[in-house]
Amino acid sequence: MKIPDKNYSGFVMLKLENPCFHELQLEVQNNSPLAFEFETDCHVSIGLFIENICIGDVLRTIWHLIPFGAMIKTDELSSQFMNPDASVVKFSLKNPTLSRLNSICQSFPNKNMHPIYNPHVTFGYLPANTEFKIRLTNPFFVICGVMVSYNDNYENSHTMYIAPDKTFSMSVTDKDGKPVQGSGWEADAFSNLK
């Protein structure tokens, strides 16, 4: 199953459900006046893609992911982001299933911009050059839900959520966050999950 339009772009991210992560996210947000839409939510970013991605492969891989354990490199603050006014607080992740998902999503819009895109957990953004120190336990086991979003030229966001009990739901919203009717291939993707 392929995304039909080569201009169709999106990302795969896991939405974390862990009290420690959310406490850290609040700490970041309380120190930052910056707003980056979905990037304000604590999540694991897997990869970016623009074409030739088999959605079924992504969904089948995710289906076996919950719950998962992940090794997190601690005290790794990254400030390398395209926005010169902001620093992103993120940590790298080591997990075989996450690596598999990342390998599926290796068709980047611009590999010169993103030559290596490793799975990482993003907590939020701070003003550029902000000193921020944090320490996490390593390894850190994560019980998570999964959110996969496909953005059609950033007009509509197609979001699938698989809960830890492997039930799932689907929502499609426009750029203003209002619900819209989904397209046919989404239902086909769900039919191949199990």
What are these regions (language model features)?
Residues M1-L193:
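Histidine-dependent nucleotide/RNA phosphoesterase domain, centered on the 2H-phosphoesterase fold
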